[in-house]
Amino acid sequence: MAKKSSIEKNNRRKKMTKNAAPKRARLKAIIADKDLPMEERFAATLKLAEMPRNSSATRIRNRCEITGRARSVYRLNKLSRIAIRDLGSKGLVPGLVKSSW
């Protein structure tokens, strides 16, 4: 089980990213627009740099929904390999069978 502080920190980052996404998108569009004057694009770059780091989507860590584990998490179902194995052995994951050959 991951530390509760790590899980909460990641949840705060998700919330902050969701709130700041439209503003970040606008600033990035201004920066990428080659038709605008260089001063305006540079000002947008400075505004983007002033935004909180945690409002960037790259700061979010994929974590297991059950255990909070950060490594070996499958994006499809948001579960770690350990959680999938436990649920599969209990028969809670449809179609998952123990392999034998």
Curated annotation (Swiss-Prot):
Xref: InterPro entries = Ribosomal_uS14 (IPR001209), Ribosomal_uS14_bac/plastid (IPR023036)
Q: Which NCBIfam families match?
A: PRK08881.1
The name of this protein is: Small ribosomal subunit protein uS14
Give the function comment from the record.
Binds 16S rRNA, required for the assembly of 30S particles and may also be responsible for determining the conformation of the 16S rRNA at the A site.
* Alphabetical list of PANTHER family matching this protein: 30S RIBOSOMAL PROTEIN S14 (PTHR19836), SMALL RIBOSOMAL SUBUNIT PROTEIN US14M (PTHR19836:SF19)
Q: For this UniProt entry, what's an example GO CC term?
A: cytoplasm
Please list the coiled coil stretches: none
**Gene3D superfamilies the record matches:** 1.10.287.1480
